[in-house]
């Protein structure tokens, strides 16, 4: 019984380890960092290079290399929001709502700036759903 219990604990850790390994295989740290910086952290350009990784995985990998917030909306509803140090995830910045609206209406990349934030939004649209990925950088 103890061996089975131990196996279940290992299994729980195995999933996390497998996810980390997959991220590092699909988006190798040093290569991804270089490519992200060269592209200006442009999601479509990075997707062309790392075509086996999802848009979501690429967007969240960006958090490791520059302070920013990544937000994903599916069909207009918040799906996931994460930030990198030194940011804490706050509900949202006003410009993010405008960027979400503009990307959803236009179906193309939108870049907006104000005195507080730079927000870039990308459409990842399919026939049956509309995903919008936002990258928000807060100015010092």
Report each predicted region and the residues it spans.
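Active-site hotspot residues in diverse enzymes, especially metal/ion-binding acidic/histidine motifs
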Residues: 1-140
């Amino acid at each position: 019984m103890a061996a089975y219990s131990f196996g279940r604990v290992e299994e729980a850790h195995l999933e996390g380890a497998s996810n980390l390994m997959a991220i590092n295989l699909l988006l190798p740290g040093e290569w991804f960092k270089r490519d992200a910086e060269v592209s200006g952290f442009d999601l479509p350009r990075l997707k062309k290079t790392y075509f086996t990784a999802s848009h979501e995985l690429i967007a969240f990998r960006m958090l490791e290399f520059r302070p920013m917030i990544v937000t994903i909306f599916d069909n207009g509803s918040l799906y996931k929001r994460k930030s990198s140090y030194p940011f804490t995830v706050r509900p949202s910045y006003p410009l993010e709502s405008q960027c979400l609206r503009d990307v959803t209406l236009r179906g193309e990349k939108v870049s907006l700036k104000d005195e507080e934030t730079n927000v870039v939004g990308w459409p990842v649209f399919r026939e049956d759903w509309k995903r919008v990925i936002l990258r928000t950088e807060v100015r010092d």
